[in-house]
């Protein structure tokens, strides 16, 4: 009997959050280990479906780095990276687009639908959702000077046209976005999926942006999870070395989204089953929340 009471208490803990977020929009960046593990894939799909059933408009943006690497290797194409960004020539872009839109997107849509949801896949080219310009990287040379490097078809999102997402939401669908954008001349661009999620969240005036990662969240220098970070504290955390390496672009993505009107951003460990529900519907959460 006690176990049943505890289950009821868990449901009641979620009730105020369900009331608060019903009718609102949440954008989720889906990637990392959560995409590779069968149990985590099902957990993710069920979380997203539940959000939709209780009236939360859910938009998914997926990555696909490992799948791209595997396919490029199979084709004998060697990737070069500049400041963590893949140099993407025309041949590489063709493979990237094929993998993201033709393989990964269909897989994500498939396992949401197979578990009882109604997902619809698209890329940033559909409905001119993500308009891009070429992203140029600034690189320091050995003499200390700064050089601008052209890394090919890597895009910087300059415009988001969310009408197609809003139409899908009204139709009861869960939009699943592949991070491929389009230039003014119709050319395809590879875009960082975290950036896409942040830009889409801002365009939809989302209540939350959630980035699923392969770490527990932002940690202090002592290795303890920082469960909540005020937006104003982020620059100091980067300057003093608390936020380092690959976490910097993720945190920056969150702060950019908050500055553009998103209410809260979360960095959550996607290796935990039902991580999305635990972060949204419990009093403590499991990741790092960044709030304005």
Swiss-Prot record:
Catalytically driven reaction(s): N-acetyl-L-glutamate + ATP = N-acetyl-L-glutamyl 5-phosphate + ADP
CDD domains per UniProt: AAK_NAGK-C (cd04250)
Superkingdom of this protein's organism: Bacteria
Gene3D superfamilies cross-referenced by the UniProt entry: Acetylglutamate kinase-like
Location in or out of the cell: Cytoplasm
Enzyme class: transferase
Residues involved in substrate binding: 64-65, 86, 190
Pathway: Amino-acid biosynthesis; L-arginine biosynthesis; N(2)-acetyl-L-ornithine from L-glutamate: step 2/4
GO cellular component: cytoplasm
Official protein name in the record: Acetylglutamate kinase
Primary gene name: argB
